[in-house]
């Protein structure tokens, strides 16, 4: 459920079909993400899951799989 919601948000933010995304998709290389778009996406995910993800976490989020891990770990600590 977490993975599906995150994939939906990423698809919406970057205007790409959900079916074209995977955990291996890289934000910068594959989606041409920049820091502003990543922060906006992180805000949407924080709102959706009712949690706070520190922007410093962006340094470690290279792929969608990395983002899923961060969200899963954040929801466990609530």
UniProtKB/Swiss-Prot annotation:
Gene3D superfamilies: ACP-like (1.10.1200.10). GO terms for molecular function: acyl carrier activity. The modification O-(pantetheine 4'-phosphoryl)serine is found at residue 35. Keywords: Cytoplasm, Fatty acid biosynthesis, Fatty acid metabolism, Lipid biosynthesis, Lipid metabolism, Phosphopantetheine, Phosphoprotein, Plasmid. Pathway: Lipid metabolism; fatty acid biosynthesis. PROSITE patterns: CARRIER. The keyword Signal does not apply. It holds the Pfam family PP-binding. Residues 1-75 form the Carrier domain. 4'-phosphopantetheine is transferred from CoA to a specific serine of apo-ACP by AcpS. This modification is essential for activity because fatty acids are bound in thioester linkage to the sulfhydryl of the prosthetic group. It is found in: Cytoplasm. GO terms for cellular component: cytoplasm. It comes from the Bacteria. Belongs to the acyl carrier protein (ACP) family. Carrier of the growing fatty acid chain in fatty acid biosynthesis. This is Acyl carrier protein. It comes from Shigella flexneri.
